[in-house]
Amino acid sequence: MGAVLGVFSLASWVPCLCSGASCLLCSCCPNSKNSTVTRLIYAFILLLSTVVSYIMQRKEMETYLKKIPGFCEGGFKIHEADINADKDCDVLVGYKAVYRISFAMAIFFFVFSLLMFKVKTSKDPRAAVHNGFWFFKIAALIGIMVGSFYIPGGYFSSVWFVVGMIGAALFILIQLVLLVDFAHSWNESWVNRMEEGNPRLWYAALLSFTSAFYILSIICVGLLYTYYTKPDGCTENKFFISINLILCVVASIISIHPKIQEHQPRSGLLQSSVITLYTMYLTWSAMSNEPDRSCNPNLMSFITRITAPTLAPGNSTAVVPTPTPPSKSGSLLDSDNFIGLFVFVLCLLYSSIRTSTNSQVDKLTLSGSDSVILGDTTTSGASDEEDGQPRRAVDNEKEGVQYSYSLFHLMLCLASLYIMMTLTSWYSPDAKFQSMTSKWPAVWVKISSSWVCLLLYVWTLVAPLVLTSRDFS
């Protein structure tokens, strides 16, 4: 009897799966806006695919992946001279699986990006596809994923590696835009509360977080100089750390310059501290991809070198373990990759709940839309509840969309490529197993992204001085 009731309970969700997001999540968040709920669902789909990609890297999945016809051919080859390769499969199948899943996700979101180009309101028939028909969209996505596993090897992995590296670099810049937006909104919110009442409390809170971020950045710089450089080597690392430290100091000084404060009073050191810490992370992440292991210690050797002086006997020499290559299933995630995924999740969730009406960065990128009126939609939602109708998420896009559907899907497409590169540690498909690490192009992509990030942040500060005809208040 319980099973029958369960079937009918699941069947009740079928109409919602074929309709809009307002129905799909109406019982969970009945007072939410349709634009927010839709983005959260897409974000959940992307996060779920990330989990699936990670599971595919586990050793337990290797047996099942080997059974796929032709899947053990081409890309991420293991040479006999490097390791006793499995005679049935000499390929890092875990990495190949991640490439296939990310390919399916990227294609799915790229097609939707093209399909949703120039959608202005929810009255557009294409908006119904964007906000609804979840059953068919999920089924199509699963179909693309399954089909991608049967793509012939050949040059697929090598070509997709280049595409993934470019897409991941672009998404790093998008993360910076979101972080700048978040920092501006955070600072503006707390400054407003400080002006409204209890200024000492909010001033202390701003000062505490700003100081904490700068202290963490200084500690990071010290650790990078100590463990990622050598007196007689690692010249590139010394250059990367030094130039980014100088650029962060310059950006912080610009943020509190009187001319900047005059045209943009909301700018301050809180935003600069967030960007500085993110830049230091990008610097560490870039150096963690260097091929030279002597200038790129892994996390375990990093910790050992810190604790060795206290753990080793006085008359002995502490032995630092040599880094070990990833397992053949490709299941190892480096520490910087975990942090990268954590930052990715935060930015993805923020991009799903933010609105264009309170975005500082949208004004700089000409992508904001402040003309959307929410009063009518809120009133209609309340009247539905009074009439006894089922409460659903409010359609707040009848007069104009709250965000660009096309750009949102393009961001998710780039995010899929970023996940692919992160889960595979930016490894090149043609790298030998005994030196399984990223090549210099991946290092330069990340470090260049950190420079562009800083330049982009400085632009958000000086834009009011340059574009005097625009309103940045």
Swiss-Prot record:
N-glycosylated. The keyword Phosphoprotein applies. One of its GO terms (biological process) is positive regulation of endoplasmic reticulum stress-induced intrinsic apoptotic signaling pathway. The keyword Transmembrane applies. It is found in: Cell membrane; Golgi apparatus membrane. The modification Phosphoserine is found at residue 371. It comes from the Eukaryota. The chain crosses the membrane at residues 97-117, 133-153, 160-180, 204-224, 240-260, 330-350, 407-427, 447-467. Glycans are attached at residue 34. Residues 1-96, 154-159, 225-239, 351-406, 468-473 are extracellular. Belongs to the TDE1 family. This is Serine incorporator 3. It comes from Pongo abelii.
